[in-house]
Amino acid sequence: MPRRRVVGQRKILPDPKFHSELLAKFINVIMQDGKKSTAEKIIYKALDVVAEKKSESHLTILEAALDNVRPSVEVKSRRVGGSTYQVPCEVRPVRRNALAMRWLVEAARKRGEKSMALRLAGEMLDASENKGTAVKKREDVHRMAEANKAFAHYRW
């Protein structure tokens, strides 16, 4: 046990345009090399493109996309005796969001559109319709957990 006090979680400041903490977190996931203003431009442009293509609000589509990418279970490696088992575990809510955002950004970076804003917009639209690489990643993780359900009793 640490002798010092337990450090609490930092409060994240909402983004300046939509006043959303979720969007602020997403901007931080997109950001590279500390270039936050560039990340904000990319996100806001992507949200504008998404709002043009769909008649829903910006944040509704982002929320729908993240909902469809969030994993409920994942596998963790657990060494028992001489062998390593992939043990299915439930994912905590904070980690669910983090994984969903990370997978959405990774999938967007692999797409072929011209700019990152267009890639991200395309991936968000696909994810909101339960298609795309990020949703496939979630399904792969769920399939892996389902396949290793026999090792669930090794949970810790």
Curated annotation (Swiss-Prot):
GO cellular component, one term: small ribosomal subunit
Record note on quaternary structure: Part of the 30S ribosomal subunit. Contacts proteins S9 and S11.
Family assignment from sequence similarity: Belongs to the universal ribosomal protein uS7 family.
Keyword Ribonucleoprotein (UniProt): yes
Alphabetized InterPro entries for the sequence: Ribosomal_uS7 (IPR000235), Ribosomal_uS7_bac/org-type (IPR005717), Ribosomal_uS7_CS (IPR020606), Ribosomal_uS7_dom (IPR023798), Ribosomal_uS7_dom_sf (IPR036823)
Molecular function terms, GO-annotated: rRNA binding; structural constituent of ribosome; tRNA binding
Natural source organism: Shewanella baltica (strain OS155 / ATCC BAA-1091)
One of the GO BP terms on file: translation
Domain of life: Bacteria
Name of the protein in its database record: Small ribosomal subunit protein uS7
Function: One of the primary rRNA binding proteins, it binds directly to 16S rRNA where it nucleates assembly of the head domain of the 30S subunit. Is located at the subunit interface close to the decoding center, probably blocks exit of the E-site tRNA.
Keywords carried by this UniProt record: Plasmid, Ribonucleoprotein, Ribosomal protein, RNA-binding, rRNA-binding, tRNA-binding
